[in-house]
């Protein structure tokens, strides 16, 4: 292509949620444009009216904005090449399809759905690839249908579609940035419908016209569009337009290497947003679904700026990319480590405040929502959580009394003498002037020695009493953060509620 500003586009259909595959397509287009000092635009391809879903446009836009993929031009942001919604460009498509009709590169087809299906079934029975039988190809284009019959139907206002005429006995060469040279035989390509009977164009016509008029230099899209590429290349030739460069991205696969589908897990960006994945982690993970820097580079954690700096289409592979949630979780944890404790405490506070609207705490709300208190929680739990919300949900005991106790831990840790030991030790804790981890640890060790028991005979049941679970951070630090009053209250409550259970 001649030297010009790089322009890429993401052109989704507003038929539902933003799929993670769509996020990857948008991201790669965004990264490539930004890496090369170009522009990235968002275009809505809403010509399939039967599949439109209310609210899908808003969902697409909000998901992309959440991910930090901000278009330079879009229905929301405007631009010099609008409208950016295909249903608002119908007159443009009619103009270009008329040009193809006038130049005998397209023709009217009045075949009914039943006729098309009957022909398709016959071809399958004959063992040939189903394609349109060209019944309505006019005589002056090499077919057998008289122009008079076509005109009669047009004059009567009968519903029809407009099809492109695929050249016979032609080999079509496609140079793909990712896949190299791919050849297509025109005998395998159907006379594609360009304009439907409702006056709306199909994807094939609209996308080619729009990409040309919007000066798109690179079409980066999923592998599923590779088989349609010969039709698009022919349309560029029909119109005499310079072709953009194409790059077809590898399929996304489930761990069993089947095509990624909702049956085996979440596929919507909003699902991962709801689960608490950060935008940095999800973008990082999605970027690695097909792309890497190459051999010898061990880096796997990237910021958006680093991705822009390092991304190239030449490093995108051809083979399918496995969507591994374990890898996503690892990347999520790495990104969490990069966030300051202060910022994490602020984010956790917002979650806790919402939680307190639904659930009452016996601890003073001004204490547990205090910045210093939350910072202590974050510092204690930072290495134990993967998501910001887990500072609240996984660590509820910092904010709420245990409502239940881990059953297996009761059977294993609550001995015949546990209630007596805890009741007495509670009095020792109450007498501590400095309720810090060192003082608590020292008091427990002395009391255990006095009673002739191992420290564990106190540590495990106290942890259960204070937190309701058998795992967590250092008990002494946990108790220090929660504070004397809450610890004493929880130990007393557990002694009242729990008893030794014989095996």
Curated annotation (Swiss-Prot):
One of its GO terms (biological process) is glutamyl-tRNA aminoacylation. Keywords: Aminoacyl-tRNA synthetase, ATP-binding, Cytoplasm, Ligase, Nucleotide-binding, Protein biosynthesis. Its EC number is 6.1.1.17. ATP binds at residue 262. CDD domains: GluRS_core. It is found in: Cytoplasm. One of its GO terms (cellular component) is cytoplasm. GO terms for molecular function: ATP binding; glutamate-tRNA ligase activity; tRNA binding; zinc ion binding. A motif ('KMSKS' region) lies at residues 259-263. It catalyses: tRNA(Glu) + L-glutamate + ATP = L-glutamyl-tRNA(Glu) + AMP + diphosphate. Its main location: cytoplasm. A motif ('HIGH' region) lies at residues 12-22. Monomer. Catalyzes the attachment of glutamate to tRNA(Glu) in a two-step reaction: glutamate is first activated by ATP to form Glu-AMP and then transferred to the acceptor end of tRNA(Glu). Belongs to the class-I aminoacyl-tRNA synthetase family. Glutamate--tRNA ligase type 1 subfamily. This is Glutamate--tRNA ligase. It comes from Chloroherpeton thalassium (strain ATCC 35110 / GB-78).
